[in-house]
Amino acid sequence: MVQAISEFSGRRPLVLTVPGLNGSGPAHWQSLWEQSRGDVVRVELGMWDTPRRNPWVTKLDQAIRSAEQPVLLAAHSLGCLAVAWWAELAGQPWGWPVAGALLVAPPDVDRRDMPAEVAGFAPTPRCSLPFPSIVVVSEDDPYSSVQRGFDMARDWGSHFVNIGACGHINAASGIGLWQEGQRLLDRLIGTAEGPMAQGAGLNEILASLTHEEAGLRTI
């Protein structure tokens, strides 16, 4: 494994977008990133309207394993839960093959009023993720509270970012290409291109990303 990490260290990572329930439409930031960036492709999980945890995790695992370079995950909504479940079940070592993840608007699947389609993703995994990660939440997300998002970030060992009132951080939020999110993603890319070491990189990434530059608030 050390040899494999050494072989691919320094290569620009592939960014895999992981949409949530019903997929991501053409105006969603994930779709726009896929169209505008040469390093971003979508994971075709299938069953977008009737998601199932195990098939989604299997499809995600196949996409990750087939990449011939480090992988970063840019997940939205229920896609964040697919990533968390993959991390719990896959048992990867620190930072390989997934070198980092941007987890945007993870829903609280443990709530009783959540859509029935997401029930199979409960309970929310609580294991620490084996890669640097950033959880991004909104103050008026109908599918999760700021506190619940903070709890997930704490359990997963993720940095926590609150961007204020931005709904579910999707196409309806009117954020277009979501430049702030791309800045966070690019910081993760920066550390994935360097040597991989447990616990290294994330603090430096976020320390260099000022609030003014990103337009974000952290707590």
Locations of regions flagged by a protein language model:
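Gly/Ala-rich beta-loop-alpha elbow adjacent to hydrolase catalytic centers
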Residues: 73-84
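Conserved alpha/beta-hydrolase fold motif
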Residues: 72-73, 101
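Conserved alpha/beta-hydrolase "acid-adjacent" motif
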Residues: 25, 142-148
